[in-house]
UniProtKB/Swiss-Prot annotation:
It comes from the Eukaryota. Mediates the association of the molecular chaperones HSP70 and HSP90. Mediates nuclear encoded chloroplast preproteins binding to HSP90 prior to chloroplastic sorting. Transmembrane segments: none annotated. It is found in: Cytoplasm; Nucleus. Residues 198-207 have a biased composition (Acidic residues). Residues 211-225, 234-245 have a biased composition (Basic and acidic residues). This is Hsp70-Hsp90 organizing protein 2. One of its GO terms (biological process) is response to cadmium ion. A motif (Bipartite nuclear localization signal) lies at residues 240-257. One of its GO terms (molecular function) is preprotein binding. The tetratricopeptide repeat (TPR) domain, forming a carboxylate clamp (CC), mediates interaction with the highly conserved 'EEVD' motif at the C-terminal ends of HSP90 and HSP70. The modification Phosphoserine is found at residue 168. TPR repeats lie at residues 2-35, 37-69, 70-103, 243-276, 278-310, 322-355, 382-415, 417-449, 450-483.
């Protein structure tokens, strides 16, 4: 049940449904409250929802349960970063690296935490920070007619939440007139916002907080002519508009597959305005589409470097890293080539947890694993390892035999013989679930490989699942009706089933069989079926009705199942 909930949580997380992921991981935690991986996963889901307090709580629990696990400290550091607790984040990442010095995620996280801590110490406190604190902010914005309607706009609400979480983020949104309007309401002052057709942006002098008497003076003054835009502001805006125009022309050319023209426009935009890294990432996308992967990687590195200098949006930096990872993946030919791909995607995810990037990371890890298997594939060495395993098996050195059979499987994962032999070893060692899994793999690889049925039936017999073992042996006999090993297996199962039917089991055997039977979902369904409950009641109280029931083949099969499991005894 816990594994199922965990799997659902992972699937929801990969698809970007973080709320569902939290719910599924919570269900799994309720079933296995000491599983550190579940707390780690839920911490990541909370962080993706910007619920950093909850993410921190789960990360602390992860470290408490598994203090020697590097990923726990990665979660802890990420949560502290989200809460702008930069020194604590540095400490968490550093502790993680003491445990796992080669972990790229921890290295990248530590670098980001140190950079954030440095920026935090270097930047002056925001003078407007108090205006955005507490629930009073939302009350003021709701009460004022000029901002009430803005609260219906999701992007505006998200910006205000970001500013409330970290008042320093106000600098990122000062060009948004809605934010300026909200700032005026919160500070109880009148701030002139840019109207359509204005050529200048708000200067610093316009943001100075006036005295409380100034609004009254403004009303008494005669209207004055609009001041001429200061040249530096007008030129700056014109420059940005010109760069944006070049970007739009580049986008249009890109859509038409006119890549050379697109590159020219993006390059021109970069020359005009070097403070917007989207021009660089767009040019990188063109290089990627053209198959010029080295050029794409150079542009992505340039975008990341420039983005950090400008303190650009983390999402833009993450996009550049993701694009670089894609280019590296296109160039990968052997499994080792995927290592920088995976590292780059991991760095992108530390910047911004994006479902698409996570999907690409999973694909890269899967491709690396598949290539490793292909590169390791060698049937001749596989046969040698299997023979070594056989020698150890004969000497009853089963752990050594398992090791060689495992190596044989790695060298040739399509050979059912290695799985069959390892299943026999697991059976000898009492590791029945592992033995059953290997036996089923034998049958999956080659349905005509009779040893697979023999191994699976033997494991089920030792697990006292006699009905299941009987069914397995009979499936094998469909391929070879005269196979003596399978016939002997059927005979042993019949003896045990008849022993139960006659009531010859000892009290201990009966109790054990009943307990095992109650774990069988089929038995549970039979016992909860209203029709079968009536049948069982008639068997005890109404022999005539019971006789009619026995004429129904389906009911008879279910009764036989209950008898075999020891739940029902016929006397």
């Amino acid at each position: 049940m816990a594994d199922e909930a965990k799997a659902k949580g992972n699937a929801a997380f990969s698809s970007g449904d973080f709320n569902s992921a939290v719910n599924h991981f919570t269900d799994a935690i309720n079933l296995t409250p000491t599983n550190h991986v579940l707390f780690s996963n839920r911490s990541a889901a909370h962080a993706s929802l910007n619920h950093y307090d909850e993410a921190l709580s789960d990360a602390k629990k992860t470290v408490e349960l598994k203090p020697d696990w590097g990923k726990g400290y990665s979660r802890l550091g990420a949560a502290h970063l989200g809460l702008n607790q930069f020194d604590e984040a540095v400490e968490a990442y550093s502790k993680g690296l003491e445990i796992d010095p080669s972990n790229e995620g921890l290295k990248s996280g530590l670098a980001d935490a140190k950079a954030s801590a440095s920026r935090s110490r270097a930047s002056a406190p925001n003078p407007f920070g108090d205006a955005f604190q507490g629930p009073e902010m939302w009350s003021k914005l709701t009460a004022d007619p000029s901002t009430r309607g803005l609260l219906k706009q999701p992007d505006f609400v998200n910006m205000m939440k970001e500013i409330q979480r970290n008042p320093s983020n106000l600098n990122l949104y000062l060009q948004d007139q809605r934010v300026m309007q909200a700032l005026g309401v919160l500070l109880n002052i009148q701030i002139r916002t840019q109207q359509a057709g204005d050529d200048m942006e708000i200067g610093e002098e316009e943001m100075a907080v006036p005295s409380r008497k100034e609004p009254e003076v403004e009303k008494k003054r005669k209207p004055e002519p609009e001041p001429e835009p200061e040249p530096e502001f007008g030129e700056e805006k014109q420059k940005k508009l010109k760069a944006q125009k070049e970007k739009e022309l580049g986008n249009a050319a890109y859509k038409k597959k006119d890549f050379e023209t697109a590159i020219q426009h993006y390059s021109t935009a970069m020359e005009i305005d070097d403070e917007d890294i989207s021009y660089i990432t767009n040019r990188a996308a063109v290089h990627l589409e053209m198959g010029k992967y080295d050029e794409c990687i150079k542009d992505c590195d340039k975008a990341v470097e420039r983005g950090r200098e400008l303190r650009s949006d983390y999402k833009m930096v993450a996009k550049a890293l993701t694009r670089k990872g894609t280019a590296l993946g296109k160039m990968a030919k052997v499994s080792k080539d995927y290592e920088p791909v995976i590292q780059t995607y991991q760095k992108a995810l530390t910047e911004h947890r994006n479902p698409e990037t996570l999907k690409r990371l999973n694909e890269a890890e899967r491709a690396k694993k598949e290539l490793e298997q292909q590169e390791y594939y060698d049937p001749n060495i596989g046969d040698e390892e299997r023979e070594k395993g056989n020698d150890f098996f004969k000497e009853q050195k089963y752990p050594d035999a398992v090791r060689h059979y495992t190596e044989a499987i790695k060298r040739n994962p399509k050979d059912p013989r290695a799985y069959s032999n390892r299943a026999a070893c697991y059976t000898k060692l009492g590791a029945m679930p592992e033995g059953l899994k290997d036996a089923e793999k034998c049958i999956e690889l080659d349905p005509t490989f009779l040893k697979g049925y023999s191994r699976k039936g033997a494991v089920q017999f030792f697990m006292k699942e006699y009905d299941n073992a009987m069914e397995t042996y009979q499936k094998g006999l469909e391929h070879d009706p005269n196979n003596q090993e399978l016939l002997d297996g059927v005979k042993r199962c019949v003896q045990q089933i008849n022993k139960a039917n006659r009531g010859d089991l000892t009290p201990e055997e009966l109790k054990e069989r009943q307990a095992k039977g109650m774990q069988d979902p089929e038995i549970q369904n039979i016992l909860t079926d209203p029709v079968m409950r009536q049948v069982l009641s008639d068997l005890q109280e109404n022999p005539a009705a019971a006789q009619k029931h026995m004429q129904n083949p389906m009911i008879m099969n279910k009764i036989q199942k209950l008898i075999s499991s020891g739940i029902v005894q016929m006397k």
